[in-house]
Amino acid sequence: ASDVYKRQIIDALDHGKRLVVDEFDSKMHPLLTSRIIGLFNSRVTNPRNAQLIFTTHDTNLLNASLFRRDQIWFTQKDSFGASELYSLAEYKVRNSAPFEKEYLMGKYGGIPVIGQFERLFDLREEEYGSTDEQA
């Protein structure tokens, strides 16, 4: 993480501020992201209740050891392209459930529509053969 980013994290924790980060997973190593989330979730390192709000595509973060269900939110595009925001807490899910696995299976929505790419995959296979073959 850059020095500026580190200062923003420390400032948020020291003063109980809200830190908003777009594409949190693109800014640093996954081990660092988990540690930073831990800093914000700890009463010891975050006594002023600072908030970390971020977007990510890193499904490894969908983990009950990092987040409560009410801290995990998903987006889903409707037929008009508008995004709907909803919480994992809206689902009847055990706290110990494998959030990442169930998300990737489509249980909570928010999964891209792969069907839109099927024709592209078919065209590539027709032109170059199976896309599963090793190069």
Predicted region positions:
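A cross-family signal for key residues in well-ordered alpha-helices
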Residues: 6-7, 38
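Short basic/glycine-enriched coil/helix segment immediately N-terminal to the Walker B
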Residues: 9-17
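Conserved D-loop-proximal element of ABC-family nucleotide-binding domains
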Residues: 26-30
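C-terminal lobe/lid and adjacent interdomain/linker elements of RecA-like ASCE P-loop ATPase modules
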Residues: 34-135
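Generic recognition of flexible, low-complexity loop/linker segments
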Residues: 7-9, 61-62
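Short, small-residue-biased leader/transition segments that mark boundaries at the very start
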Residues: 1-5
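Generic beta-sheet signal
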Residues: 17-19, 52
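Walker B catalytic acidic pair
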Residues: 22-24
